[in-house]
Curated annotation (Swiss-Prot):
Pfam families: FWWh (PF14922). InterPro entries: FAM227 (IPR029417). This is Protein FAM227B. Residues 497-521 have a biased composition (Low complexity). The keyword Ligase does not apply. Disulfide bonds: none annotated. The gene is Fam227b. The keyword Coiled coil applies. It comes from the Eukaryota.
Length: 573
């Protein structure tokens, strides 16, 4: 059986000509016959001339507007400037003596560090004509329905928001995220309208303007609520009411520095409660404003400048009228740049942060309440009701959980800090008294030792004289006894005229010797325990032995005087 011979597979065409040949199209267009060939050839030749490179270039050159002249002139100027720069640089660095590489680099680093440390944003310095009133009485509200009413004293809402954010010391990434949301136009509108609504509510009530502002506040809050991404809504709106309350409070402090006494703790409590209830429908915890880091606003602006104290400013303004023109003191410069002015001790002490201390009592009374965690924002409900949006139910099923709430605060009582301070003060007073009494006891012991030494020396001298002349010994001894009696009498008179505390602390009489151990024992039990008590007992024994030695010496002297008198009588007889 014969096998079929394999057929050769035809290769695909590799070029356009091979493709035409494989399709039997290689004869086209050779077989095309055109009438009036001369006319077609002439037309084809003209067409080739019209679409040539030279013709197209010449046409574009004449008809298309060119900007190359401007570019050429700019390039020529840049080349000229580059040449001048190189020439100037060559003149600067032609000598190596003019530069020091090490010193240049060190100075550069030092200058960069200096600029980084003292860099501050540019601030708008208001002239005297632009200065406005800095108290509540001199401020008025002008409602603008189609635009926001500007804050007093040309304040910028963005700067106030940034100041509040920086006080929280947020991380850089978190700061950038919240910054984009809190500096949005609807958040700025909330700050403006909330500030003016609270200004009218607290100081200059106007029902019509307040209602208009409240409508706009609701619209701004709904717009902000819809713009925040869903994944950030919960976290953002947990912190935003507190941030807005701080921003409004900061605006009041910056707008009316002369009325800062009105912005007390009650003002902050009412402001925060109102904003929290508007935005979330829940009241914050009592004393929520204690964590605000805005204590320095009374003495420092949001830009870091020191405020001129009100009393000092009034004094300067009153003295300005009596200042002569020859004195080179510029009051305006001092008022515009008060950084060099000293801060009053009262204001600096008020800026110190005080830690809260609890009362020494049983604490507040508590009770259980139902906490509704399905509450809604009154602003959003008001917005829905105002626009009468259909198909949206504003009612909800109450869901809640019991939690503990304070029923009654404890009555005022000494706090633990006050008790600790009082105990420390008493301990310091006792320590001072102990040191004073201890020093007095040491002085008394030293005095007794010196007196004992004097008595011993006097007795030795009398014993030495006894062997020489009995009459002289008798006279000297009588003089010595008379001297001791006079000193004892003077001391008794002095003790009678002295205060009871001094008579108790004296060690010259038996009563003082009995009272001083009790006093020393009290101080020893407070400060040093048994060791000081042992020392006081040793001191008592020493004092007792000293007095006994004095008594023995007195008895010996009496015996010697009797012996001397008897010997003198016998010799005389």
């Amino acid at each position: 059986m014969e096998l079929p011979t394999p057929q050769k597979v035809q290769e695909p065409p590799k070029s356009f000509e091979e493709f035409l040949k494989s399709q039997n199209w290689d004869y086209w267009p050779r077989d095309v016959h055109i009438r009036d060939g001369d006319i077609w050839e002439n037309t084809l030749r003209k067409l080739e001339e019209a679409v040539s490179y030279n013709s197209v270039y010449s046409y574009l050159w004449t008809n298309v507007p060119r900007l190359y002249e401007i570019v050429d002139s700019m390039e020529s100027k840049l080349k000229e400037c580059s040449h001048l720069l190189q020439q100037h640089a060559s003149r600067l660095f032609e000598s190596d003596r003019l530069i020091s590489k090490k010193r240049t680099y060190t100075n550069l680093d030092r200058y960069k560090a200096f600029l980084k440390e003292h860099y501050r944003r540019k601030k708008i310095v208001l002239s005297d004509q632009m200065e406005t009133e800095k108290n509540i009485e001199g401020c008025t509200f002008l409602l603008k329905q189609n635009e926001l009413t500007q804050l007093p004293r040309h304040l910028d809402a963005k700067q106030i928001y940034l100041y509040v954010l920086r006080t929280h010391n947020l991380e850089e990434k978190v700061f950038k995220v919240w910054k984009t949301h809190i500096l949005s136009d609807c958040s700025i509108a909330l700050l403006h309208d909330c500030f003016w609504w609270w200004f009218l509510h607290k100081f200059k009530p106007d029902k019509r303007d307040q209602d208009w502002l409240f409508d706009r506040i609701a619209e701004s809050y709904v717009t902000l609520f819809m713009r925040i991404p869903l994944r950030r809504k919960d976290i953002f709106f947990q912190m935003y009411p507190d941030w807005l309350a701080q921003a409004v409070y900061t605006t009041f402090q910056e707008s009316f520095p002369e009325s800062c006494s009105l912005f007390n703790d009650n003002f902050k409590e009412d402001l925060g409660n109102t904003i929290f209830l508007w935005l979330s429908g829940l009241k914050p915890a009592p004393g929520f404003w204690t964590h605000w880091k805005l204590q320095d606003l009374c003495t420092t602006t949001i830009h870091g400048c020191r405020r001129v104290p009100v009393k000092l400013r009034r004094g300067i303004m009153s003295s300005q009228e009596h200042t002569s023109a020859t004195v080179g003191l510029k009051i305006e410069d001092i008022l515009k740049n008060p950084r060099a002015l000293p801060v009053l001790k009262e204001e600096s002490a008020a800026s110190k942060v005080t830690t809260k201390s609890h009362y020494r009592s049983l604490g507040p009374e508590f009770y259980k309440v139902l906490f509704d965690f399905g509450g809604q924002s009154p602003l959003i409900l008001y917005y829905l009701k105002m626009h009468e949006l259909g198909g949206i139910s504003v009612t909800y099923n109450p869901k809640g959980s019991k939690f503990t709430k304070i029923l009654r605060e404890p009555p005022p009582a000494p706090t633990y800090c006050e008790i600790i301070k009082d105990a420390k003060r008493k301990f310091a007073d006792n320590k001072k008294d102990f040191k004073r009494v201890k020093q007095r006891i040491k002085d008394d012991i030293k005095f007794l030792k010196e007196q004992q030494e004097q008595i011993d020396k006097e007795l030795d001298r009398l014993q030495a004289k006894a062997s020489k002349n009995l009459q002289e010994v008798k006279n000297d001894f009588e003089n010595f006894l008379h001297k001791l009696r006079v000193e004892a009498k003077l001391k008794e008179e002095y003790r009678g005229s002295a205060s009871p505390s001094e008579s108790l602390q004296s060690l010259q009489s038996p009563n003082s010797s009995l009272s001083s151990p009790a006093m020393s024992e009290d101080f020893n039990s407070v400060e040093e325990g048994g060791l000081k008590e042992a020392r006081s007992d040793h001191y008592l024994r020493t004092t007792h032995s000293s007095f006994s030695s004095i008594n023995l010496i007195g008895g010996e002297c009496t015996t010697k005087s009797t012996f001397c008198c008897s010997s003198l009588k016998s010799s005389h007889q």
